[in-house]
Amino acid sequence: MDTKTQSLPNTHAQPHSNSRPQSHACHHCSCSQHCQSRSRSRSCRSRSSSRRPRSHRSPTGRQGQSPGPSPPLRRHRHTMHSHQCPSRPVTHSCSHSKNRKNLEGKVIKRKQVKRSKQVYKRKRQSSGRKYN
């Protein structure tokens, strides 16, 4: 390959100016570097991806069968939840704010009822003490 690439710029150098074959040769170098870097990154990615399942498999094998299946389920739930989240919050927040208002009103009413009962009991007790 090296002999061919060296002969090509020489043939180009005779009819054309010297600048073109040099840039062409440089372009070739950059391409080869890109290819090498890409192949390296791919190999790194493939290595890391091959390492990941091994690391996940080994702890589950050591711990036993019961903890093994549970983490993937949790992850699946997380992914499902994250997919559903973007559509939910708008409707959920609206309904939740309405529910909050209603609940606050109900809670206030309940408190008022409790207070009135307590006051009534106190009055009865105080009146009962007076009579006794």
UniProtKB/Swiss-Prot annotation:
Please provide the Gene Ontology terms (biological process) for this protein: acrosome reaction; penetration of zona pellucida; positive regulation of protein processing; sperm DNA condensation; spermatogenesis
TM ranges are none
Pfam families tied to this protein: TP2 (PF01254)
Native source organism of the sequence: Bos taurus (Bovine)
PROSITE patterns named in the record = TP2_1, TP2_2
The family line of this record is:
Belongs to the nuclear transition protein 2 family.
MF term (GO), any: DNA binding
Positions carrying Phosphoserine: 127
Q: Which UniProt keywords apply?
A: Chromosome, Developmental protein, Differentiation, DNA-binding, Metal-binding, Nucleosome core, Nucleus, Phosphoprotein, Spermatogenesis, Zinc
Tissue spec: Testis.
Name-wise, this protein is Nuclear transition protein 2
Q: Which residue windows does the record flag with biased composition (Polar residues)? A: 1-20, 82-94
InterPro entries noted in UniProt = TP2
Q: Which residues bind Zn(2+)?
A: 12, 16, 24, 29, 31, 35
Function statement: Plays a key role in the replacement of histones to protamine in the elongating spermatids of mammals. In condensing spermatids, loaded onto the nucleosomes, where it promotes the recruitment and processing of protamines, which are responsible for histone eviction.
Where, subcellularly, is it found? Answer: Nucleus; Nucleus, Nucleolus; Chromosome
Q: Where is the composition biased (Basic residues)?
A: 37-59, 108-132
Instruction: Map motif Nuclear localization signal onto the chain.
Output: 105-113
Taken from the UniProt entry, a GO cellular component term is: nucleolus
Which parts of the sequence are annotated with region: Disordered?
A: 1-132
